[in-house]
Amino acid sequence: MSTNEGSLWGGRFAGGPSDALAALSKSTHFDWVLAPYDLTASRAHTMVLFRAGLLTEEQRDGLLAGLDSLAQDVADGSFGPLVTDEDVHSALERGLIDRVGPDLGGRLRAGRSRNDQVAALFRMWLRDAVRRVATGVLDVVGALAEQAAAHPSAIMPGKTHLQSAQPILLAHHLLAHAHPLLRDLDRIVDFDKRAAVSPYGSGALAGSSLGLDPDAIAADLGFSAAADNSVDATAARDFAAEAAFVFAMIAVDLSRLAEDIIVWSSTEFGYVTLHDSWSTGSSIMPQKKNPDIAELARGKSGRLIGNLAGLLATLKAQPLAYNRDLQEDKEPVFDSVAQLELLLPAMAGLVASLTFNVQRMAELAPAGYTLATDLAEWLVRQGVPFRSAHEAAGAAVRAAEQRGVGLQELTDDELAAISPELTPQVREVLTIEGSVSARDCRGGTAPGRVAEQLNAIGEAAERLRRQLVR
């Protein structure tokens, strides 16, 4: 049987919790990462108590000195949680009381509950964590942009349903992976608007009667505002769910990029060669070079999706306000951040180190009659209704299949027999270069448009980098 010695809540209990309850309740094995934020918030809370007339100058200075000493010991590892500590809050209060005594150390708890405290600390930690993740995402975007810039004219088969569809620029395809990641960064910027609301001053759920100033502590801790509703402030974890969604979405976007790399590096495709430093071998097959980073990215995406789903399931049926279920809110989010901090540098390095086999991609670009749409659209430009043009292009594909040749290898007579509008001038678009150049619309794969897109992505990345600084 445990005791209530050092507990934050034991006064009305005749004895301590059972060993099983103490083990179940313990959270220092994951919430200790909040310790620096807890100490920062305690400094700010000390000042709020002083301004409210609840501490003398001597008491204020004593608490601040004790907190500074404790912070140093936490930072260098000389102070940490004991097996008897329930959570980060009780561990740090024990450390503070050891330094300043129970009378002074016990004054810091006035006007705050673990309910508003942990909600604030979680927001503080998460606002920093999303910025670390964002830096890693920007590195992947940068690697994609650099590869796109290095291959401005390389042409590859564009695919739908994993079937050859139309020729596109390799740079266009690479930037198609950068755009979703930039949207993820926009989500992080937008998320911070809602995360930057301080629950401090809400107490357990009803606020405080001690004349404290929630706006002052919000400003001291870098929040943009104090919460408008104390019940909501202590109970809400939509900010955590929103972050978990953004993390899962980043993982999904990385997984789609990883899938392309896995397929492209296969013998059958042969689009890319993996660098030795960013691939692994086989314990039995000497010839293997495996895309493990990409495969782990694909696998970890499921883990982050699971973290999001688990958190939402935890939140879905809780009555207001705080419930102990919310102890389960942090581990999935902490894990998602940890996995992305492992994965993002590896993906950035993998992308940057890829060697593209541009000749093979160019050779495969017209395979599968990928120029058929160009033929149909050329006829449309000659005034042929698209339905008729589509049928003529299909007939041309059938004729080429029967001969076992590409569309560009059909003779002038064969083309004319299919449609009198198919004059020799159609050959201008029956090349992969002509095909990509013809798609000169906004967002298209023409070289000039892709160059514009590359510049825009660079500008967007710089804008986001500035927005994420605080």
UniProtKB/Swiss-Prot annotation:
Biological process annotations from GO: arginine biosynthetic process via ornithine; L-arginine biosynthetic process
Pathway where this protein functions: Amino-acid biosynthesis; L-arginine biosynthesis; L-arginine from L-ornithine and carbamoyl phosphate: step 3/3
Gene Ontology annotations for the cellular component aspect, listed alphabetically: cytosol
This protein's UniProt keywords: Amino-acid biosynthesis, Arginine biosynthesis, Cytoplasm, Lyase
Alphabetized Pfam families for the sequence: ASL_C2, Lyase_1
Enzyme class: lyase
Gene Ontology MF annotations: argininosuccinate lyase activity
Catalytic reaction(s) noted: 2-(N(omega)-L-arginino)succinate = fumarate + L-arginine
Subcellular location: Cytoplasm
Record carries keyword Nucleotidyltransferase: no
InterPro entries: Arg_succ_lyase_C (IPR029419), Argininosuccinate_lyase (IPR009049), Fumarase/histidase_N (IPR024083), Fumarate_lyase_CS (IPR020557), Fumarate_lyase_fam (IPR000362), Fumarate_lyase_N (IPR022761), L-Aspartase-like (IPR008948)
E.C. numbers: 4.3.2.1
Similarity comment text for this entry: Belongs to the lyase 1 family. Argininosuccinate lyase subfamily.
Descriptive protein name: Argininosuccinate lyase
